[in-house]
From Swiss-Prot:
Its main location: membrane. It catalyses: beta-D-ManNAcA-(1->4)-alpha-D-GlcNAc-di-trans,octa-cis-undecaprenyl diphosphate + dTDP-4-acetamido-4,6-dideoxy-alpha-D-galactose = alpha-D-FucNAc4-(1->4)-beta-D-ManNAcA-(1->4)-D-GlcNAc-undecaprenyl diphosphate + dTDP + H(+). NCBIfam families: PRK02797.1-1 (NF002752), PRK02797.1-2 (NF002753), PRK02797.1-3 (NF002754). This is TDP-N-acetylfucosamine:lipid II N-acetylfucosaminyltransferase. The gene is wecF. InterPro entries: WecF. It is found in: Cell inner membrane. The keyword Cell membrane applies. Transmembrane segments: none annotated. Its EC number is 2.4.1.325. It comes from Escherichia coli O6:K15:H31 (strain 536 / UPEC).
Length: 359
């Protein structure tokens, strides 16, 4: 049997590193279909830190896509597992027959499913991408994204799968002992990416709570984002006093980020699509409820796991937030499907499906 090849077709260092380390640590030892990778980006020590994997790095999307297409044409039994995707040339190859549906398995990360960009280039490309997505052999996604995808592609097979968020299961009960009182701290967004709509989110928080809460905005990732960070900071200072606004421009190490999250009382995410599952998981683990846009279908996954969900359209106040915290504290977090290690079973099944080992 031909070994499955995993493709990280866009240079997203943080996510790519998370996926590679997860496969190295949790999957490679038990499955030959969890070891071969083609990745856009620099090695930066990844090969050394992931010795169980065979990783081929490419300088850009175009060179990787050309290599994938060549492999697909040379051996029609070769199957590929595309993580996130984000590579237009690969969608076009699937649409034109360069890659066959039986070779193309896609784990949806959110962005490459939704059509939120207003630029002309995107508007011209979206219909082609939509046609290509009808030809995917199988999609793997959250419950909400599967539901969203099925509305336009009902004939494509869909399987539940969660991004392998880095989590320590021993922390699942840690937050239950914490007493929450006094001025609330609200986390706005999960990164410095513009898709977080930080300024709109800050205005929404201010409309709900005024200048009575402390707002923390983590913007240390992606790099080279100084102009936008300053734009967000200035917009925030028009709404909140300096002592109530903390815009973080430096990238935080994982433990420091965990510490930051555990100082918060609420997470506020205004974006109208599924994203930021890693931050949501870590907040929920810490007993911190989240406010979602009702258009973000991840609320379906949360309610399926009996987790409280607040929406940006709700009338929010401290009493409502404290009640959501109380409800969250009563949930057995060891049973949540999208927490580690529970998502591991879904990954083992996904590998077997993509490799053709199970129907």
């Amino acid at each position: 049997m031909t070994v499955l090849i995993h493709v990280l077709g866009s240079d997203i260092p943080h996510h790519n590193r998370t996926v590679l380390r997860f496969f190295n640590d949790a999957l490679a030892a038990t499955s030959e279909h969890a070891r071969e990778f083609m990745v856009v980006g620099k090695d930066d020590g990844l090969s050394d830190s992931c010795p169980a994997l065979s990783v081929q790095f490419f300088p850009g999307k175009k060179s990787l896509a050309e290599a994938v297409i060549a492999k697909a044409k040379a051996n029609r039994q070769q199957r590929f597992f595309f993580h996130g995707q984000f590579n237009p040339k690969l969608w076009l190859a699937l649409l034109s027959g360069g890659i066959k549906p039986s070779q193309f398995f896609w784990h949806i990360w959110g962005a490459d499913l939704y059509e939120l960009s207003s630029g002309l280039r995107y508007k011209l490309f979206y219909p082609l991408r939509r046609l290509a997505q009808k030809r995917v052999g199988c999609v793997f996604a959250t419950r909400g994204d599967l539901s969203f995808f099925a509305k336009t592609h009902p004939k494509v097979r869909g399987e539940l799968l969660y991004f392998p968020t880095r989590m320590d299961p021993s922390l699942n009960t840690m937050a239950n002992d914490r007493q929450r009182e006094g001025k609330m701290t609200i986390l706005v967004g999960n990164s410095g990416d513009r898709s977080n709509e930080h300024i709109a989110a800050l205005r929404a928080v201010h409309q709900q709570f005024g200048d009575t809460v402390k707002v923390v905005v983590p913007m240390g990732y992606p790099p080279n984002n100084e102009a936008y960070i300053e734009e967000v900071r200035q917009a925030g200072l028009e709404l909140f006093s300096e002592e109530n606004l903390q815009v973080l421009s430096e990238k935080l190490e994982f433990d420091a980020y965990l510490t930051l999250l555990r100082q918060c009382d609420l997470g506020y995410f205004i974006f109208a699509r599924q994203q930021g599952i890693g931050t949501l998981c870590l907040l929920i683990q810490a007993g911190i409820p989240c406010v979602l846009n009702r258009e973000n279908p991840f609320w379906q996954d949360m309610t399926e796991q009996h987790l409280p969900v607040l929406f940006t359209t709700d009338d929010l106040n401290e009493d409502i937030v404290r009640e959501a915290q109380r409800q969250l504290a009563s949930v057995d977090k060891n049973t949540i499907a999208f927490f580690s290690p529970n998502y591991l079973q879904g990954w083992q099944r996904a590998l077997a499906i993509a490799a053709g080992e199970v129907a």
